[in-house]
């Protein structure tokens, strides 16, 4: 594999997926709507990534360029590329679907019948399958059979903490990332040869890893943020270094972990080690990750398929403990941030209709359920 088009030249695109591809000697073309960013990348064709773990190292990523994702140029790149990846955020997938569809149609018209694989690297379950549905809406029906044959829509699970760039840094392209990274793809969805990229793991059981990440990293991260906000902590590291918060977050991850162990057969000791590794990642002294960034969009995070309610539903399914998950949900309801429209809407709903009706509206939990009653009690105690 020689070429990739990557939609989204933000911190995750540059610091995670783009870096892994470039490190594997793939020529990466970033596609983004941020004109100054595109200009910088296409002019310099390299950028620095600060990788922080137990120590700090700076890597230079080369063999990259960039085009505007609203231009004809990105369509022409899709005509010739071997791989398309995205890190744009779930809401933007629907917007870029039309561009990808135009690229596929033009690719076939130009006679390029080599297999093309597309991997959405987003914080959502089966994000590429969702993207596929949107792409097909923009494709002529006469092309569907050919796309089915030649274009692989490959679902993935991604995990790497990439906080916003430090304001003090005068290099707009430099990005800071943690040393830990996990990119797991569904091997069965590729068309043609499955690419070999260091750092991209292949599996036949993707959903187990999607839920492991959602129920552990994402669940723990947002509960750390919401409890941290209540205690006046500014960063995730400050919050997790509070022993009471750390214990609460660990217990919540163990409750969600019990669901994973029963559902997918994860080894109990190995999963416990995974939880400990995540707690250590939250305490990384080199990562300045603000609780407001991690806690933002609380309504989305309270959705039935997201990081708080989905593990809770699993504990109900298996009849297992969930007290700490319930407390995490109560803490999410307390989240206040005047610059976050979802936080404002959530607080307005709580004031107007109360806890039970707000939970029923946003989480799909039944208003008269035992869980909602417990969350209301915990909410009033926080």
From Swiss-Prot:
A biological-process GO annotation: mannitol catabolic process
UniProt superkingdom: Bacteria
Record InterPro entries: 6-PGluconate_DH-like_C_sf, 6PGD_dom2, Mannitol_1_phos_5_DH, Mannitol_DH, Mannitol_DH_C, Mannitol_DH_CS, Mannitol_DH_N, NAD(P)-bd_dom_sf
Broadest EC class assigned to this enzyme: oxidoreductase
Alphabetical keyword list: NAD, Oxidoreductase
GO cellular component: cytosol
One GO molecular-function entry: mannitol-1-phosphate 5-dehydrogenase activity
List of residues binding NAD(+): 4-15
EC number: 1.1.1.17
Pfam families listed in its UniProt record: Mannitol_dh, Mannitol_dh_C
Gene3D superfamilies: N-(1-d-carboxylethyl)-l-norvaline Dehydrogenase, domain 2 (1.10.1040.10), NAD(P)-binding Rossmann-like Domain (3.40.50.720)
Catalytic reaction equation(s): D-mannitol 1-phosphate + NAD(+) = beta-D-fructose 6-phosphate + NADH + H(+)
Family statement: Belongs to the mannitol dehydrogenase family.
Name of the protein in its database record: Mannitol-1-phosphate 5-dehydrogenase
Organism: Vibrio vulnificus (strain YJ016)
Source species taxonomy: Bacteria, Pseudomonadati, Pseudomonadota, Gammaproteobacteria, Vibrionales
